[in-house]
Amino acid sequence: MAMEVSLQHEIDTDDDMLYLTTIRPANKKPIILETLWHGIDYPNDSLVIDWISKIKKFQEKKKQKNLILSLFPDRKAQYKNSGFSYYDCKGQVSKAPFELLQLCFDNHCLFYEFEHYYPHKKYPLALWKCLSDNKTIVVGLGIEDAVKKLEKDYNIKISNWVDLRDKAREKATFGEIANNCSAEKLANKVLGDEWDVNKPATMEWWNPEVKWFLSDDNVKFGSLDSFLAYRIGVELLKD
């Protein structure tokens, strides 16, 4: 049976939006994810810096040697209502720069939106340092290509990364792992629970009711994938 995934808008400020995504796996207690979204038009990065400080404190409490972060970069060219883009042309989507950086530590997600059309925009140095730190392990699906593209387009240098599909194959206990295996299907294999969810065939990038805000589906399913990737990474990287 597919999980139920719901979204609640918690705080709406001039700079950011805080969302709560509730996941209800079958026969399990609900899991609540907290997602901070930071849009491209907002100059105040203090909440992003606070988010990084917060997850590092959680890391210390967990006594984890390395900070494990899941990474799911995304681009609007493959979504409905995203606006015209040169990269919407057939065969060009993969060349488009990423426009949304989805990160997750435990139940805490950060959606940081950046825009390649604003080459002089200054991004929070704390975020770049966190991702490039050798003590940060960045995990994801098909992450090698994403790491290369982020460095090319935004000078984000991620030195310590792990592809979760490849790592699961190394264990040789999870059966065949397809090259396009989704976060939900990989979670079923690695975490041992049912994490299937019914996603819409197509999703909108923007919220049709609130101008320039991400759609609810974009936030809740992006948060789910980021959370599952984090949980898978923690499990596969156990000593």
Name each model feature, range by range:
Residues 1-71, 77-79, 117-118, 152:
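N-terminal accessory regions of nucleic-acid-interacting proteins
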Residues 39-49, 65-66, 83-215, 220-235:
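Conserved DEDDh/DEDDy metal-dependent 3′-5′ exonuclease domain
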